């Protein structure tokens, strides 16, 4: 039911098990993998592998280059899921610091919608979660991108499979 889902989501966001179990970071983020002694050491992890897939799509490459080129001075220039080339640079401590800083009620919007006793739900949220945190100033503003002084051109090569034609995998974006 709705009340139970609110509890599950609020608990997952504000009290995740990542602080008690580093293996969650290793499984979900990134870790080293070696199936046998003959194999090379390789990176692994749910997010790492998902982002490798996202970065292999021509459309995904185009989307990222367009955002990075249009908004280089804002958070939109960065891939929210992480760039697989730099994901392995993330430490467990940096991961926890990021959660402590940004996953805080002071940096949240909570939306409730539907036919319910709104005052009851808001009181519950306050008593069970929000009142247990002190206010913390969080700078999470999305910076304004200043207009460019001149036209910017950007080329981005990407790989395609050997059996794919360049004709069906060539893109141009005019912004």
Language-model regions, residue ranges each:
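Short secondary-structure capping/junction motifs at helix and strand boundaries
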Residues: 2, 15-27
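A common structural junction motif
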Residues: 11-20, 127-137
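Extreme N-terminal "head/tail" segments of very large remodeling/mechanoenzyme assemblies
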Residues: 25, 29-30, 49
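Helix N-cap motif at beta-to-alpha junctions
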Residues: 114-119
